[in-house]
Every structure is written in structure tokens, then in C-alpha cells.
Amino acid sequence: MSSLTFLGATGTVTGSKYLLEAGGERLMIDCGLFQGLKELRLRNWSPLPIPPPSIQWLALTHAHLDHTGYIPRLVKDGFKGQVYASPATVDLSKLMLPDSGHLQEENAAYANKKGFSKHDPALPLYTYAEAVKSLESFRAIDESKPLELSSHFTLRCFSAGHILGARMIEVTVRENGSVKRILFSGDLGRFPQLILREPVVPEDGFDYLLLESTYGDRLHPRDDVGARLASIVESTAQRGGTVVIPSFAVGRTQELLYLFRELIEQGRMHSLPIHVDSPMAIDVTDLYRRHEEDYDLQTGALEAQGIKPFSPPDVHFDESVEDSKALNAVHYPIIIISASGMATGGRIVHHLQRCLPDHRNTILFVGFQAAGTRGRLIQAGQPVKMYGQYVNIRARIETLDNLSGHADYGEILGWLHKFQKAPGKTFLVHGEPAAAESLRQKVAQELQWDVSVASYLQKVQL
């Protein structure tokens, strides 16, 4: 009998992995890293409950590491199947997975050097070379038509609006005359969109819906995001400080560049030097320029007019380590956009270590900060450790919730209301417990749907 098993993104927003089984074949949807709390990160080191060589296919909703970052380990442990994703997700993964492997090696080397790992020696989950090798399995999906993997599984993809290349995935599962349709929402984007196409409403008639619940317990502010962003930058500049923005290299950095360009062109903000200090974000921005198929009409019109959407005045793309270090010597107001978005690693950690103790500076969070991450600790004003030492927090801490790449519960419910027929069963995933339970109650009360919160390793007979 066909089945669905939840191998991640239950009780947390990380580690997305879902396993479909039918007719002796296995298809995995997403293959992400667990991040944040130590108890979650330790799952990355535990063997999967099924042997990787027994999985024939993997399909990806989008390129974020909490959905793709375990792939090199899966391949290292014996997966020999094919990985299907949108063209933009394939291109983004070519950047992000090798970078993740490099960071894994870097963190292990640093732990060995400083001796703060309990393991001797500390080893990377996978290496740069292993990440590069895993990319050999990737294949791009043609969104315009279904992809029949076998007599048991057929895939279709739809725009999800979360980041460049993000897709919902519909899987048709056939076994012993039974046909089941399952929709994986992936990470659902906002309504309306700043740059990308909005999430579509696929055809109705799903037997199962797996729905994300990141913001299942809150609404994003509806105030003018540009006005607030400009106000934070201007007030910091008046103090002679630096605005440090931990930003996801994919999606959020490009939205910030788009907004800064608009604000400066409209005279709503003075032009300051903007430094994108993330080789990954720089490469991703180039991909955003190339994959116009994901643009909404407004962004496409800008390109047609010769306007570069992601190039505000006085923007600097700091590729080299020397360029990054040079920012330490700057003593006038600037904006630094750097990865990672939750401050778990990357160049942003050095900028935070330097800028957090100075009251003139502002640390601006522009995305979700998962429990247990350095970003969540800073956001809450709690003691935070960097490179083995606690750092004093004297800088102003601001959060811009409007820029989230995830739909809030109002937007999710609005999307669900467009379904002409309720799914047979809805499972909530990709949310911390309070958020998922809150959304469950709202969906049950407002839509009268059969809905529950999925649990880790739960197996459902389809």
C-alpha cells in the first residue's frame, strides 16, 4: 500500500523531507538540513530510517538549504537517483550546495583549531567536493507539462512565489488501481509579490495537502515597508552608525536591493554606500537577472525599459575577503548586507561581532529567525557567543517583518479559500509548534477542513 512519511519539518521550520512509497519505489520530496536547536542539528548526523540507495527520485520545491542541504550527505550515503527541480532551483543549487560544503569544512576546521568540539577530530557532514559531486544528479523540470517518473509517480509543478525558482509540487501516486493526488505547498510566498509571480492556485481535487505553517500564528504588518526601512537607515546614519543586515543570500538580498533602488529613486531615502558582502548573494543576484521567467509583470517591465531592478546607486558587491575586511576600517554611515540570514555562519558573523557593541549601529533583521539560531538570540537581546566569546549587545536591534518570504496566516487562508474543493486531508508542516497549532485551529474553524499537525516520523497510509 502506498504511504507518506514525514522525515522533517515537523515541529520546526527546518529539515524538510517527505517520503512517498508506492509499488516498491520511493520518491522523496525535499531533502533539507535541520538547523537551529542542537537537538535538531544532531538529526543531520543520524542515519535516515530508510537506506538512501533505496530512494529512486528526489524532487525539490526550492533551493534553500533547509530543503536541499542534506542532498550531498544523501548521495554520500548511497543515493544514486535523479534530483528534479525548476531550472532556477538547479542553478541556485549549483551555488548553494558547494558553499554549504565549504562551510561544513570550515566549521569543522575551526572547531578543531579552537578545541571546542566534543569530537576529536570534528568532521564535516559533507565536503565541498561531495557537494559538487551531488549536483551531477540534478535535472530541470519543464513546468508546462507533467513529468512521469514511473507507472507509480507523476510530478507537476506550480509557481510558489517564495524565492526564485520556488515551486509547489503535485504528485500523482498510483498503486493497485488506486490513484491519489498530493500537493506539497513548499514554502508559500506573499500576496502581493515584490519581484516574483504570486503563488498559483492549482486545480482542485487533491486527496492530501501538505501546507507550510511558518507564520501560522501571526500577521505581517501592513504598513509601508519602504517608509520603515528608510526611517531605520536615516536614523542610524544621523547617529554616524552602520546598518548591518543579516540577509538570506537568496531572495531577501535581492528584495532589499530592489527596495533601496526604489526608495532612492523616489527621493524617500538619501543614497548611502550599500555593500553586499556575500559572494553567494552576488552570484544569486546575477541569477535573478537571468531567470526572468519567474518575474511578475512589473519587474519584467522594468527590465524591458532598461532599468536594472537590483542596482541601487552607490552599490558595491564585495567579492573578495580583502573587500570584506576593508569594511572594518570604514568610519562613516554605510549599509552592509551579508549572509547568512539567521547569522549562523558566513561573513555576517564578523560584522556582528564588530558592530554589536557600538550603540550607534543598527542590526536589522529582515527574515524569520529560527529557534536556537544566533539571529534569534540577538533579536531577543539574549547573550550571544561568537567564535567562542560572548559579545555585548549595545547596538539597536530592529526587525522588519514586512519583508518575509512566507505568507502569514491571513494570506494562507486567502489562498486556501480559492480552492473550490477541500483536500481530503491537510497536514501542517514547516512550522514551530505554536504556529502550526494556531493555523490548524484557524483552518478547521474557518474552512471546516480535516486538518492536523504532522509529527516527526509519522507514516500515513494513502
Where are these regions (language model features)?
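Active-site neighborhood of phospho(di)ester-bond hydrolases with catalytic His/Asp-centered motifs
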Residues: 29-31, 55-64, 71, 83-86, ...
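Pre-active-site segment of Zn-dependent metallo-hydrolases
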Residues: 10-12, 22-81, 85-136, 188-199, ...
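Core dinuclear metal-dependent hydrolase active-site scaffold
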Residues: 1-53, 133-197, 322-329, 335, ...
